[in-house]
Amino acid sequence: MSNKNLLSGRDKELQELAEQYEAAMAENKPFYQDADELADLADWYGTKKRYDKAFEIAEYGLKLHPDSTELMIEYAYLHLDNGKQAKAREIIENLPDTYSPEAKVVRAHLLLSEGKLDDAEQLLDTIEDKDDLANVVDVSYMYLDMGYPDKALAWLDPVKEEYSDEEAYIAVVADCLYGKGMTEEAIPLYNRLIDMNPYSAPYWFGLAR
């Protein structure tokens, strides 16, 4: 699970999609979306700690799109978030695409949950485009979620000049600094994020912490 869905505009879109999904289920109506939309929706429910709904939408999505790497990865993350490493491993080992950056990040998450830091780092080092913002953000949030903010910053620092004005970059750096206890350094970044997206509850929460 990543925090990409909390960025400006996307959280609201997914809130609306969740309302549509729940209304359709309540009325026993079909609800069709692309695999990536359903994966994002499952992730959105997960970030809200609504895991029953998150699992429900992931499993519903996999019935519609059984070969979707995106949905399988999200399904694996949900199991990892709930301490079900064995099931997560089974899903990860059966991913249709094991070489994508997203597949490597979720496998690294599993390795870290098993205490295999060196193996996780070696795997992440095989990601080809380490300067791609999406890859940097995914890896950084994974490290941060697993309690390694310094490892996250090691991925963030090399691309600082290129992405220092990007909302996604600023958000993960702010969260990493907060994770290291560097609250004073994080506050100006949360203020920048609020200027970019004044209606984002996570940014206000970050500032209030």
Regions found by a protein language model. Give the residues of each.
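Short coil turns that delineate tetratricopeptide repeat
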Residues: 66, 98-100, 130-132, 163-164, ...
